[in-house]
């Protein structure tokens, strides 16, 4: 690894380091893609197991859905963001400009 590719440290604070050019698009390594695929597949299994709890009747070690006992009133109007949809919109907006 060359010194230009490593982040520089100064009194325990990260300073600017060389960044990848932003105009090249997103490039992912095979390891990154494998990790994303693993997380995605595992999450689908968890969702399936939550919807079909009979698979875990004999075993209490299955996934458990967490529900707040006292929901925060400030989050009552919270609407989750679909990150893939947001990325698509941002990509389309950047192509228009």
From Swiss-Prot:
Annotated motif PXDLS motif, positions: 80-84
One example of a Gene Ontology biological process annotation: regulation of epithelial to mesenchymal transition
Subcellular location: Nucleus; Cytoplasm, Stress granule
Keyword Transferase: no
Compositionally biased region (Polar residues): 1-26
Biased composition (Basic and acidic residues): 54-68, 84-97
InterPro entries given in the database record: MCRIP (IPR029428)
Annotated region described as Disordered, given as residue ranges: 1-27, 54-97
A GO-annotated cellular component: cytoplasm
Keyword set, alphabetical order: Cytoplasm, Nucleus
Function: May play a role in the regulation of the epithelial-mesenchymal transition.
Entry's family note: Belongs to the MCRIP family.
Protein name: Mapk-regulated corepressor-interacting protein 1
Species of the source: Danio rerio
